[in-house]
């Protein structure tokens, strides 16, 4: 309460301590002003927000959310032997995230691990452009583009990280009018 403002920057361990983070966040938000808005921070903790964005007309990677091992097996089978990205819906730093063949033992093992701990698993088809490092992040402040980065590829096909370690390689990029329009539409949908 002795602070005028709290800016949340990098709470990288929140996925391992969700309940503790939420309790702390509720206490702090009751005592001081928080950026971003507390409701937005809570909404953003779980990547199931992607389904809400899709319902609002925003293009997202097709995603199946599963909470049981039977549903995970069915979701993986629907992809045959294609490459898929698997990850918990509450995650950061690509923890328990992998790019694997849908019919591989690694896919079943990761699905089991995520679901057994009570988390929701996301199953997404590989988007080759993203696997090649073309994912972009556009940062808007008060609705205006501040800057953009190409995030770089992280996941090695077959599991693990490229080069064996989690290493982000962001590069500042110039955006297209189409990318800015998409970012603005996404913010408006939130």
Task: Label every model-predicted segment.
Residues 6, 34-35, 61, 85, ...:
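Structural detector of well-ordered beta-strand residues that form the stable sheet scaffold
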Residues 1-67, 71-73:
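Conserved N-proximal alpha/beta basic substrate-recognition cap immediately N-terminal to
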Residues 2, 73-79, 112:
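Short amphipathic alpha-helix with an adjacent loop that forms part of the alpha/beta core around
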Residues 101-190:
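Phosphate-binding site of ATP-dependent enzymes
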Residues 53-54, 79-97, 118-133:
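ATP-grasp fold ATP-binding core
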Residues 52-60, 78, 103, 113-116:
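Basic phosphate/pyrophosphate-binding loop/patch that engages nucleotide-derived ligands
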Residues 39-41, 67-71, 89-93, 103-106, ...:
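Short acidic/polar capping segments at secondary-structure boundaries
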């Amino acid at each position: 309460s002795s602070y005028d403002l709290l800016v949340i920057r990098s709470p990288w361990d929140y996925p391992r301590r969700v309940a503790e983070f939420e309790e702390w966040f509720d206490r702090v938000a009751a005592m001081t002003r928080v950026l971003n808005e507390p409701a937005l921070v809570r909404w953003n903790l779980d990547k199931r927000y992607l389904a809400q964005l899709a319902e609002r007309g925003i293009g997202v990677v097709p995603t199946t959310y599963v909470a049981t091992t039977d549903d995970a097996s069915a979701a993986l089978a629907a992809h045959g032997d294609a490459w898929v990205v698997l990850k918990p819906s509450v995650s950061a730093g690509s923890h328990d995230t992998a790019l694997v063949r849908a019919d591989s033992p690694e896919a079943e093992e990761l699905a089991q691990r995520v679901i057994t701990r009570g988390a929701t698993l996301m199953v997404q088809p590989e988007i080759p452009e993203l696997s090649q490092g073309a994912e972009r992040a556009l940062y808007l402040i008060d609705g205006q583009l501040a800057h953009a980065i190409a995030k770089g590829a992280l996941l090695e096909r077959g599991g693990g990280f490229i080069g064996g370690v989690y290493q982000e390689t962001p590069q500042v990029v110039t955006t297209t009018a189409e990318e800015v329009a998409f970012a603005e539409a996404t913010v408006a949908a939130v």
